[in-house]
């Protein structure tokens, strides 16, 4: 073994990448370049990978090689869940965790002065995701180096102090002398609740000489068996059958909540809250704002009473600065604080994720400023916030930006270190591009649409305005072409339904203004038509054109038509770059005797698992986002049939959640809600 290979082996020995896939095309070179960059201490690198080129597999190999705790950041829950599922399959023997917002529904507290309307915070917490968040922090604090956390931008939002979280853990070992009641007291400090009847997550049951702990961050039950005041055994049990899974000599029990504090810190916090309350009330009174002063005094006084009696109150996160002991204006603790200093950060779809990271702080402060100004909250509420972008950057160590169209920021941060990955394992090429005049563009488009319909393929049409999208949809429907449109006025559930009906063949054409959204990488789409492509602007710049054209990149007949009367700089750059990639892809296919093959859309995480059991090594094909249930038949169902379907969907949803297939579960839930709404209407 060469020295370099030995070095990589020793560094990555904590990670075990399990896959029958083998790096192909650009992947081996990309893996090597990114790995060497990390090893050499390069601060930032960019992986420019086209749709379907296997970027996730490349990143998995880099993680294995460098052997560091890794945070993978995605810009939405759905894509984060997909990445989590893929990483879980690649690293089944390592700690792969999922950290996103645990709200199924969240209405933030707000006040609208123009109408004197106060909106109370309203939320619904997803218990399963709460468990997974705790599992992520527990894994990071355990000292393990083989931890991968896939997260949304929730990772920059405030949470408990990791030092406090770590201080509260209870270490147990066989032979340890500890009174059973002392153990129960310490578990209570960790916010575990005693329940000797039925045991749920975060609860403790006592029966004779055994203490059963339903860990807040695990699906397993921990059983502590005593012999007098000595721990005789520590076992992990199946919670349903109570069958032993594993025995331990020692075990660390972590808190049942990310926000945990002790009595002393609570009393100190209350004193500081009272001091700040007096100052703010005096401030309002001097300004003649008696209503605001009275409102603030009543609200905060009530909160203090609740904290004293129960240890918490509604909106306690607005007092987090006091409990953390932070100075005014300082950043909150967040998930990044749980990582060691040498962690690796991977930002997926960085052209979208980075701007999102920029925007979080401003939006949060705008709402909080109004609440403070009108006496609903103390100024300290503004310190319960997401990180500023500058704070986020300061906390990062080494980063890999991943995108098919990296923005100027990523390229500048990478100082020109852009690793290219344009060869697809399937041999598929970038779509060919044609430029046609705008005169009679609709008639020309109609001919192209008819050809696609004959081949049972789908079409995406991009217009400049919502009105144009609606008018074109109406026209196409009038000619007998099954057409739908998507724009900002179409809500999320309706958008998902339309996309699925496009895939199912209910629609042949989808018209939209901005079809850059993730989840539109549909193998059935062979044609992308961009109307008025020469109108320079946000949706017609080089990056947007490249992203839009890429929607046809998963089809063997992929083609893009730009309707324009002139060639703009953005069009020229897009055409030149696409042609360059196509030449490289064609050359690779010819050299390796590869015939482009149509992508089979992977429908579920279960399909991925089934695929991974094949024995013949092959190239990794990046899965397209999950397919939603086809709903065309729903209109023909009776009410009773719909109720039966809802019951079936609920059962499947619960099964999917147990298998950690959260994308599947969410889709099944949405379909269930849609059918329920139809019954009620």
Stretch-by-stretch model annotation:
Residues 5-601, 608:
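ASCE RecA-like P-loop NTPase motor cores
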């Amino acid at each position: 073994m060469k020295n370099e290979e030995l070095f990589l082996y020793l560094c990555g020995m904590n990670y075990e990448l399990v896959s029958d896939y083998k790096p192909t095309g650009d992947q081996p070179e990309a893996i090597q370049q990114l790995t060497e960059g990390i090893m050499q201490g390069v601060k930032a690198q960019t992986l420019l990978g086209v749709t379907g080129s296997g970027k996730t597999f490349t990143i998995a190999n880099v993680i294995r090689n460098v052997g560091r705790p890794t945070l993978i950041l995605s810009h939405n829950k759905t894509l984060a869940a997909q990445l989590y599922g893929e990483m879980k399959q690649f690293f089944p023997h390592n700690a792969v965790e999922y950290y996103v917002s645990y709200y199924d529904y969240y209405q933030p507290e707000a006040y609208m002065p123009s109408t004197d309307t106060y909106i109370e915070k309203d939320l619904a917490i997803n218990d399963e995701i709460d468990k997974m968040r705790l599992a992520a922090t527990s894994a990071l604090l355990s000292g393990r180096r083989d931890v991968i956390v896939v997260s949304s931008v929730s990772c920059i939002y405030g949470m408990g102090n990791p030092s406090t979280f770590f201080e509260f853990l209870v270490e147990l070992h066989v032979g340890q002398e500890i009174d059973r009641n002392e153990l129960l007291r310490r578990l209570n400090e960790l916010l575990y609740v005693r329940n000797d009847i039925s045991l749920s997550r975060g609860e403790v049951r006592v029966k004779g000489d055994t203490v059963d702990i339903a860990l807040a961050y695990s699906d397993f039950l921990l059983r502590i068996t005593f012999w007098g005041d000595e721990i005789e055994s520590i076992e992990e049990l199946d919670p349903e059958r109570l069958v032993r899974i594993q025995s331990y000599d020692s075990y660390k029990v972590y808190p049942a909540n990310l926000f945990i504090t002790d009595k002393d810190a609570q009393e100190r916090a209350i004193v500081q809250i009272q001091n700040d309350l007096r100052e703010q009330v005096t401030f309002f009174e001097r300004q003649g704002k008696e209503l605001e002063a009275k409102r603030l005094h009543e609200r905060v006084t009530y909160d203090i009473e609740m904290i004293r009696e129960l240890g918490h109150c509604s909106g306690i996160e607005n007092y987090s600065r006091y409990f953390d002991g932070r100075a005014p204006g300082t950043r909150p603790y967040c998930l990044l604080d749980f990582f060691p200093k040498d962690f690796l950060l991977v930002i997926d779809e960085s052209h979208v994720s980075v701007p999102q990271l920029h925007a979080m702080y401003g939006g949060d402060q705008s709402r909080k400023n109004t609440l403070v100004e009108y006496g609903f909250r103390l100024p300290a509420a503004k310190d319960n916030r997401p990180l500023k972008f500058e704070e986020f950057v300061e906390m990062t160590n080494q980063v890999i930006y991943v995108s098919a169209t990296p923005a100027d920021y990523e390229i500048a941060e990478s100082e020109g270190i852009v690793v290219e990955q344009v060869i697809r394992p399937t041999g598929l090429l970038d779509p060919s591009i044609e430029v046609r005049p705008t005169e009679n563009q609709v008639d020309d488009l109609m001919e192209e649409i008819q050809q696609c319909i004959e081949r049972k393929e789908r079409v995406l049409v991009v217009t400049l305005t919502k009105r144009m999208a609606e008018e074109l949809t109406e026209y196409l429907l009038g000619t007998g072409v099954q057409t739908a449109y998507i724009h900002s006025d179409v809500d999320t559930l309706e958008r998902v339904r339309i996309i699925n009906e496009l895939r199912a063949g209910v629609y042949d054409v989808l018209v939209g203004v901005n079809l850059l959204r993730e989840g539109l990488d549909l193998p059935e789409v062979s044609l992308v038509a961009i109307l008025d492509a020469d109108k320079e602007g946000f949706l017609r710049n080089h990056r947007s054109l490249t992203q839009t054209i890429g929607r046809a990149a998963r089809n063997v007949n992929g083609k893009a038509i730009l309707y324009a009367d002139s060639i703009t700089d953005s069009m020229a750059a897009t055409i030149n770059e696409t042609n360059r990639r196509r030449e490289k892809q064609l050359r690779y296919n010819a050299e390796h005797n590869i015939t482009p093959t149509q992508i089979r859309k992977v429908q579920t995480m279960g399909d991925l698992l089934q695929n991974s059991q094949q024995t013949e090594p092959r190239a990794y094909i990046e899965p397209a986002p999950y397919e939603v249930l086809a709903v065309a038949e729903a209109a023909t169902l009776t009410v009773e049939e719909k109720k039966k379907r809802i019951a079936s969907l609920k059962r499947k949803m619960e099964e999917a959640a147990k298998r950690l297939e959260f994308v599947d579960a969410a889709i099944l839930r949405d379909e269930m809600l849609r059918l329920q709404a139809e019954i009620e209407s």
